[in-house]
Amino acid sequence: MKTFYVASYGKGNDKGIYIVSFNEETLELKKIQQILTQDFPSYLIAKNKELYVSYKNAKSNNEGGGLGSFSIHKNELILNNNYSSSGRSYTHLCISDDNKYIFAANYHVGATAAYKLENYRIDHKIGAVRHTGMGPDLLKRQTAPHVHNVGFTPDRRFLYAVDLGADKIVMYNYKDG
């Protein structure tokens, strides 16, 4: 039996985060738990018995979007906290190896954000860097920055942000803090 997590943009009571089990012998899927969310969960990371989620703003104002942190207890998710990004919608996340920081890619405004984690909770926003530039396809998707992925280089010396809109990879020196 394997357990995994699903983020859903569903409508009404279908929206949220699901815990699903998969029986490899019978090929049966079973919904274990659903957590209804106000915003659209768009990306999930499970690490160290914690689940981190990025939310796409589902509201027409700047109150939604952001990050969430859940503790994983057997087959149940328990909310640690949510942290609003004031309408910003993150599309990808990564966590530092020491579990002190979470980094977020914001496709819609073309920015990379950093948050401090404290006891696996999202404590506060450290800052954000807005990207600049355009890519070669000025008639469609590359008229402005669109950061869609963040991660660490294999040697962990740099945080990178892949920017589809600006058609570049931005490298940030990474040091603890």
Pin down the residues of each PLM region.
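A short loop-to-beta-strand structural motif that recurs across blades of beta-propeller domains
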Residues: 16-18, 65-68, 111-113, 168-170
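Residue-level detector of Asp-centered blade-edge/turn motifs that repeat once per structural unit
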Residues: 46-49, 95-99, 154-155
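Short glycine/acidic-enriched loop and turn motifs that connect beta-strands
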Residues: 10-13, 57-61, 108-111, 166-168
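Beta-rich catalytic cores
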Residues: 13, 39-42, 89-91, 146
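Residue-level marker for isolated small/hydroxyl-bearing positions within beta-strands
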Residues: 7, 54-56, 105, 162
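Short loop/turn segments immediately following beta-strands, especially the blade-tip
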Residues: 21-27, 70-76, 115-124, 173-177
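Asp-box/WD-like beta-propeller blade repeats and closely related beta-sheet repeat scaffolds
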Residues: 77-148
